[in-house]
From Swiss-Prot:
The keyword Ribonucleoprotein applies. Keywords: Cytoplasm, Ribonucleoprotein, Ribosomal protein, Zinc. PANTHER family: 60S RIBOSOMAL PROTEIN L36A/L44. GO terms for biological process: translation. Gene3D superfamilies: 3.10.450.80. Component of the large ribosomal subunit. Mature ribosomes consist of a small (40S) and a large (60S) subunit. The 40S subunit contains about 32 different proteins and 1 molecule of RNA (18S). The 60S subunit contains 45 different proteins and 3 molecules of RNA (25S, 5.8S and 5S). InterPro entries: Ribosomal_eL44, Ribosomal_LSU_eL42, Ribosomal_zn-bd. Zn(2+) binds at C12, C17, C74, C77. The keyword Cytoplasm applies. It is found in: Cytoplasm. It comes from the Eukaryota. One of its GO terms (molecular function) is structural constituent of ribosome. This is Large ribosomal subunit protein eL42.
């Protein structure tokens, strides 16, 4: 279980800052895939008409987790940076801090 606070003081690469400032932390999420990307246009053109599936669909998935990517936004200049963490099964943003002798809860 990885628990990350919602704010973090870290170095900002922005042109105005270039020093340690407070950052707002969020979890990165991939955007919606565009219908007009060249690969998608080519794939749709190939798929249309008769002939079934034209490209193989990947089935041999090996990984059970994804790497968590943090999106850090500077509260001063609004510059955004991304910070990848290690793989983990349970990720929590701004959860309660651990107490001594307490059982883990998911």
């Amino acid at each position: 279980m990885v628990n990350v606070p919602k704010t973090r003081k870290t170095y900002c690469k922005g042109k105005e800052c270039r020093k340690h400032t407070q950052h707002k932390v969020t979890q990165y999420k991939a955007g919606k895939a565009s219908l007009f990307a060249q690969g998608k246009r080519r794939y749709d053109r190939k798929q249309s008409g008769y002939g079934g599936q034209t490209k193989q669909i990947f089935h041999k998935k090996a990984k059970t987790t994804k790497k968590v990517v943090l999106r850090l936004e500077c509260v001063v200049c609004k510059t955004k940076a991304q910070l990848p963490l290690k793989r983990c099964k349970h990720f929590e943003l701004g959860g309660d801090k651990k107490q001594k002798g307490q059982a883990l809860q998911f």
